Each structure stands twice: as structure tokens, then as C-alpha cells.
Amino acid sequence: KLVMDFEEEKSSPSLPYAVEKYSELLKSDALLIFDGPQHESDLPTLNFGNRGISSITLKTYGPIVPQHSGHFGNYAPNPVFRMSNILSSMKEENGIVKIKGYYDGIQITDEVMQYLDDVPDNEKIMRDKMQFKIPESVGSTYQESLQFPSLNVRGIKAGWVGSEARTIIPSELSCLILRTST
């Protein structure tokens, strides 16, 4: 049996219905998931476990309707600055999550660290391909960092940008945060 999920990056909206509808047909003894990028060495890899996901939408509010910043700037609260303060309180500059208990239960044994260290990652090549210099410091290596839950801002929506830009204080900001965990 083979199930292909082409909506995985948008939370698989059709999958629950398909699983319920075809539950008898999908019964099996095991589940094997093929996910993740091909390793840069082109060598085959095998991962034990996948990251799960949970998400939350945060909202901050300013005036009940958008206001002209020339008339109400420095008076009407801007929800963008409120959210930026909230978000910056969640992570250190080096990427480590500051939320109490966020990493509770994560233990990497010496044996597991040895396995992780044996993966032939060339992190300089990886960073060059993605065009950034300094990685976050949650783990000492790429492989170690994958063993910890991540905190990601998936999207922010507020105000106007591009050809619609205005000198307006927006009335609200919506931010979708997700946590992936092992």
C-alpha cells in the first residue's frame, strides 16, 4: 500500500478525511514515512522518528480601525511593535528558546551523539547553499540541533506593504507560530 501526501507542507488538509474514508483499505502492520531532504553526500540515510508539529496563532491589537501615523503615531499603539516584543522574548539571539520547560525531556546520550557525529555533514557547504554565515546554536552541530524542538514563525500579517504601502498604524497583527518536536 502506498499513500502519497502532496499537501504535507500545508498541514495535509485532505489526509484526515481520506484516512477515515479508507481506514479498512489502509490497515497495515507498519508505517514507513519517506520525508526530508536528500543528504548532501548522496548517501542513503535512515531517520528514526519524525518531528511532530503544533501551532498557535497570536494576535496583537492597536486601534479598533487603522489610523494615520502622522496623526496618531506615538499615541495609538502599534500591534507590530507589540508582537515584535513578544517574539523577541521567546528566543535568545543565538536561537535558543527562552520559554521555561521548552527543552524538558530531551536527553542525548553519548552513544546517540556518536551516531550524530558520524553523519558526514559539511556544514560550511550547507550554509553556503542557504547563504547564511552563522547557524543558530541550539545544538553544536546540524544533526544535534535536529534533536531539539524548534520554534518557527511561519507567517506574520499586518498593515500594508509593496504597492499598497500606506502611512498607517494597523489595527491588528496576526502571527502563526509553530513548534516542531521530536
Residue ranges and their predicted role:
Residues 37-39, 63-65, 158-161, 180-182:
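Short, glycine-/Ser/Thr-/acidic-enriched flexible segments
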Residues 5-7, 156, 180:
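Short strand-loop junctions, especially beta-strand C-caps/beta-turns
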Residues 55-60, 155, 166-168, 179:
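Short beta-strand elements
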Residues 141-167:
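A structural supersecondary motif
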Residues 26-27, 171-173:
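Short, proline-enriched alpha-helix->beta-strand connector loops that line the catalytic pocket
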Residues 75-76, 163-171:
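Short, solvent-exposed beta-strand/turn "edge" segments of beta-rich domains on protein surfaces
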Residues 1-134, 140-149:
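Fold-level recognition of mixed alpha/beta catalytic cores in primary-metabolism enzymes, strongest
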Residues 173-180:
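Short, hydrophobic beta-strand segments
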